[in-house]
């Protein structure tokens, strides 16, 4: 039985002249992250008649490390800086004073707090950090963000509330290591704070 099979481009069985092209073509472009910051400044009247200026900055963190909810409490040390540090890496950092360490504290506030309540709480913890030896205190407001999971918390009145989102505040500062435990104790007991966690910042090492 005779059979014919065309297996090569010959004069007997010429193959069509087709240019060699890849079957699939992929293209991917990376878009650099751009931080959209909105600086804010508010002045609050203190009991003694003087004024206290609260500096804060609202940042857009979509697509960064902090996107999608609050991180785990199991890791007490921030791995080589957080997403906020990355977003602000172009900003010159102050030199760490002798005997102090650089820390970040992320606090998630009740989502129903008013702007005045939030500014008052911000002032309270700025003053607490300074009283504990803190320096170069800055606060960054992320706004209301959905939580990665629901959080139940009982307040001092015995009421239990379940939260699905919260106002994220990030405090960056230099302080003595021994002042972190008292700070976390106050944060945990605060009815206005759903969750909080403090991290010591590790500087990146370049070869």
Curated annotation (Swiss-Prot):
Keywords: Chloroplast, Plastid, Ribonucleoprotein, Ribosomal protein, RNA-binding, rRNA-binding, Transit peptide. GO terms for molecular function: mRNA binding; rRNA binding; structural constituent of ribosome. Residues 77-86 have a biased composition (Low complexity). Disulfide bonds: none annotated. InterPro entries: Ribosomal_bS6 (IPR000529), Ribosomal_bS6_sf (IPR035980), Ribosomal_S6_plastid/chlpt (IPR020814), Transl_elong_EF1B/ribsomal_bS6 (IPR014717). It holds the Pfam family Ribosomal_S6. Its main location: plastid. Residues 69-99 are annotated as: Disordered. It is found in: Plastid, Chloroplast. CDD domains: bS6_chloro_cyano. GO terms for biological process: translation. Residues 1-59 form a transit peptide. The keyword Plastid applies. GO terms for cellular component: chloroplast; chloroplast thylakoid membrane; nucleus; ribonucleoprotein complex; ribosome; thylakoid. Binds together with bS18 to 16S ribosomal RNA. Part of the 30S ribosomal subunit. Belongs to the bacterial ribosomal protein bS6 family. This is Small ribosomal subunit protein bS6c. The gene is RPS6.
């Amino acid at each position: 039985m005779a059979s014919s099979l065309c297996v090569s481009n010959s004069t007997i069985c010429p193959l069509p002249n087709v240019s060699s092209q890849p079957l699939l073509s992929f293209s991917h472009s990376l878009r650099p992250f751009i931080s959209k910051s909105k600086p804010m400044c508010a002045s609050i009247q203190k009991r003694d008649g003087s004024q206290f200026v609260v500096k804060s900055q609202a940042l857009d963190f979509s697509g960064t490390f902090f996107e999608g909810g609050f991180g785990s409490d199991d890791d007490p040390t921030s791995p080589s800086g957080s997403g906020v540090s990355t977003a602000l890496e172009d900003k010159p950092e102050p030199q760490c004073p002798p005997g102090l360490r650089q820390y970040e504290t992320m606090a998630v506030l009740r989502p129903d707090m008013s702007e005045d309540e939030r500014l008052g709480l911000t002032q309270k913890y700025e003053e607490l950090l300074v009283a504990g030896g803190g320096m170069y205190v800055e606060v960054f407001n992320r706004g209301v963000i959905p939580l990665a999971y629901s959080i139940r918390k009982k307040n001092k009145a015995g009421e239990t509330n379940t939260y699905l989102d919260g106002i994220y505040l990030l405090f960056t500062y230099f302080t003595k290591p021994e002042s972190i435990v008292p700070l976390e104790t106050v944060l945990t007991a605060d009815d206005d704070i759903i969750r909080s966690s403090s991290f010591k910042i590790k500087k990146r090492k370049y070869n």
